[in-house]
Amino acid sequence: MNEIMLSIRDLHAQIGARKILKGINLEVRAGEVHAIMGPNGSGKSTLSSVLAGREGYEVTAGSVEYLGRNLLEMEPEDRARAGVFLAFQYPVEIPGVGNMYFLRTALNAQRKARGEEELDAVDFLGLAREKMKLV
């Protein structure tokens, strides 16, 4: 059985007095891929924002655990280091910064936060090629 990576239980959240999430439940195990789908206004962006720790969203009930840790008690920076963050669907290209360099920097920030050794460019490229075979 695969480890539970993300567990959301009876999550309620609001912005101001407007209640948006009303009892969300979701469990994601290692190796699973889930798509959050729904019409405009159904709470997809709110759920993402709550998980990432964006300001302005108030969780009024429920719990969220990520890799056994209470995600709702973590600062947004700590969530990002753990791997929970929002990224642009169409990121702005930064001249001179390639995607592989950007991804290696992001991965190494996570590895450093976990006390693991950072990957050099050669090791990262090998890892990236290995993971691309899975897609």
Regions found by a protein language model. Give the residues of each.
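ABC-family P-loop ATPase nucleotide-binding domains
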Residues: V92-V135
